[in-house]
Amino acid sequence: MQDKEKQPIPNQPKKRFTPKRLAFIAVFVALSYAVSLLEIPLPLFGASFLKLDFGNVFIVLLSFLLGPIEAVIACLLKESLRCMTSSSLCAGELANFIITSAYLLLPSILYIYKKNIKTVLITLSVGCVLATATALLANRFLIFPVYAYLFGGSIFGMTVTQAFSAFWVAVLLFNLIKSVSISILTLLLYKRLSNFLKRLKI
């Protein structure tokens, strides 16, 4: 009898958490955390509590390079590190985690099915809108109430509702500026890191 022809082994799906990929995630978490400490005050309309940082660029890049699940985990780890020195009972860090997740999930999921720069550009634009809308909700129902609690029930002498009414435009513009800035930096770094990752075979 002749030996049966060996059937080709189908392509195996990539393992999600190999040592190499975990190391890659750890590096991006460290970079994101370190850069997030370099905050730039952006007191729009007198909102002195608004501070801009670009740490999430590395989280968004990770979402395209490895996938949305890895990016959300990395974001959670980064915000957990920031919680250690938080002065807001981790409310700001929790809000940032929610906002960042809202920003990156749609772009990174769609990118799985269509990997090109056009997909990145269009979906990041949508992500900016989603992040800004989520930020308004997070500030109204999470950050402002927590800060009011920390400062004896008021923010700058105002109730939560009054403070949000006074600062919502500043919050909207701030988060729009932040998400657009992160999108631009992501687009500038995306191609180089994508090629680098291919060489690493992660």
What are these model-derived regions, one by one?
Residues 1-202:
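Loop-helix junctions at membrane interfaces
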